[in-house]
Amino acid sequence: MKRQLLLFIHLLPALLFAQQEVIFPDDFKTNALDGKEVTITNTLTLTNNYSYAYGSITLSDGPLWTPTEKNLPGVEMFNQKNKENQDNQITVKQGVYSFTDANGTCRIGQTVAKLTGTASYSNGKYTITLTKKPEFQCNERPITCEIEEDYNLKVVSFNVENYKGTNDVQRTKIVAALKAMDADIYALLEVFGNSSLNDLCTALNTACRTDQYKYIENSTANQGMACFIYNSNTVTPFRDLQKNKLADNGYLPDRKIAQAFDLKANNERFIVCLNHWKAKDNSYNKPDEYADTGDGQGSHVLRRVHEAEATLEFIKTVTAYFEDEDVLIVGDLNSYSKEDPIRVLEEGELINELQKYVPNEYSYAFFSNNSYATGYLDHSFATATLDAQIRYAHPFHINADEPDALKIGGKPQEDNMYRCSDHNPIVTFIKLGTTTGIESPSSSHPTIQLIGDPRNGYLTLVSNTDLALTRAEIVNIDGKIIAAHDTNNAGNTEKHFTLPVKSLACGFYLLRVYDTQSRCTTCKVVLP
């Protein structure tokens, strides 16, 4: 009995001061853990690294999403989701253990299991001071930007955050990012005029020891514009740059542009429609209809809705001008995935490629309503015909994930690509020319000749084979059949077909034509 008592007395300190296993946030609703050393058994996600340089970060039970990234706008929803985000945060102080990895960073999206430290309670909130070095996992810094799927075209859309060509560190970091992504086309935003664009393109060529990168001039104005740099070894611009003036307001057409490119490998064409829509800025006077209603969409949502509607109209214009139906719509739309402007595009039958491939990633992180939350402000959409040729789309996680202290002008300042901007670039991989859902003419398919002037209200289709034509379908750029015409006689032997087009609006169309063996080919038609 005496030996048992002595053993109990010997173990008493360990029993009194043993680490207590807890779950966050369930076990942190009262002050019962104050002063105790705890081990949080559930895996936590790093959601705020803004103050990492000062020795503290914020962890949560899973990622924190901007409310309208995952939910339809609404005042009640917005308030509820903000409260959930606020309640799902715990501040962690490093103590004698550093948060940073070998690269000197700690990234949003990293996870940690079995976090151990001393809990302190103040003003209704807990703070954990580490007593054991944490082991962070996941979301490591990316180095290259490739996929396993076969593709022949890579498009990068990227807000480069006020590039003026006057900051050597910014130039070095942006060029490092462009070089690492190795795109055929760079669709860039917030480049200040043609002189800054020339500066960036020249620096990219110098870094790559080549002269293959060219640019397309947009504006001489010293203000942020949308623009293109392209690899002249792989693509060639077709016709002139087009500006969307359907939502005109001063210089804003410089921020909404479109350009067609022909892929040299197979002469296939597609169009890039690049956009930078109105910001959510609430810092100055505005008409009442543009005010923040508290539903989560911020200021100027009606303006962005108008820009979305104008984009749908602009697509019709540029498909006719560039004579192709394959359109990629990219850019900083200043709208999260469930907000009204994005739904306008989706209801316009554009395909949201990021929601298709990586719905649980993000391009931007922002502190608002007492939480640092993530979502997509930058997007990749495609018309139905191009969607069939897209192999993948995703954000390149080099910026929004990194601590704000590493931004240009911060300390420490390194000449790598990480935190070269506040937005993650969006990369879209395309196998251009693979399929539009219609087989192209060949020796086993009829070749069609179009005769006549569509302004007269009809076209005549003529086949060069011995088989008669039986059916013609007119398809719009969204892949929908908007008109179909059959021969009245099942025993038809005619190799020509009269097709009425008087009721069709001006624009670009695909024409599917079938013969008596149900073989199909396609023609491109532009109605003036």
Feature names for model-found ranges:
Residues 18-158, 162-172, 180, 206-207, ...:
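Extended non-catalytic accessory segments flanking core domains
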Residues 191-193, 197, 201-280:
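Structured beta-strand-rich core segments of catalytic domains in phosphoester-bond hydrolases
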Residues 61-102, 243-244, 283-302, 356-368, ...:
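Surface-exposed intrinsically disordered loops and tails
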Residues 31-35, 40-41, 97-136, 194, ...:
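Metal-dependent phosphoester-hydrolase catalytic domains
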Residues 156-163, 188-192, 216-221, 230-232, ...:
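Active-site-proximal beta-strand/loop segments in catalytic clefts of secreted hydrolases
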Residues 439-528:
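C-terminal outer-membrane/trafficking sorting elements
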Residues 93, 122-225, 285-313, 324-326, ...:
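N-terminal, active-site-proximal structural segment of metallo-dependent hydrolase catalytic domains
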Residues 1-19, 520:
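Bacterial Sec-dependent N-terminal signal peptides
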